Amino acid sequence: MTQAPTASLTLTPVTSPAGGKDFASSVIYQVYPKSFYSSAGGAYGDLRGVIEKVPYIASLGVDMVWFNPFFASPQNDNGYDISDYYAINPDLGTMEDVEEMIAALAEHGVGVMFDMVLNHVSTEHEWFQRALAGEREYWDYFYIRPGKYAEDGQLREPTNWESKFGGSCWSRFGEYTDEHGTPLFYMHLYDRTQADVNWYNPTVRDELFKVVNFWYEKGVRGFRFDVINVIGKGEELL
């Protein structure tokens, strides 16, 4: 396996989400914004709805609120297909709403935890779109490999690995081929619209750390790293 590059976050260590408790003894309350509460009385929740309910949340005696993703996303996987880590799904609110929500919870002694998806990005993310447009440096942001030809001459995926959502975890990468004319594929361990990023690329790792630090600076004090267990791949197997 390729050795992982050395990199580090710049977060200041914290031992408790709020109230002096450690995480092991803290009460963490999950909020899926789309279904929590609508500030306009509509069918779907929004961040303004969460802000309105901060006193109620605090009254439950919770130490931290864990939010499912509300970043910009085409919503092919309920927000776990992120197209921009620095933007908010406009159906749910704005960056100003997020800042107000974090501040309101902090005033009530409640910390904030985000779901953070670093294993993959939406195929609508700028990185993947630039890769598709032919910017070769962005090819290294993902796992792009040539297919293989079987004895019968049929084109096969690079490996026989399956997606968690069914079928192969490889999809054609546009119309691109390698130097031998073999079609290229990109890896997606989940939906085909969720391209796995190359954790072993130092630039990618630094970009992901920038994301985490950005939200830490906004006041987020906890992160649940979704499917982080699959972020490293055995490159010798690809």
Protein language model annotation of sequence segments:
Residues 218-222:
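A glycine-centered loop/beta-turn motif at secondary-structure junctions
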Residues 223-227:
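Extended, hydrophobic alpha-helical segments in both membrane/secreted and soluble proteins
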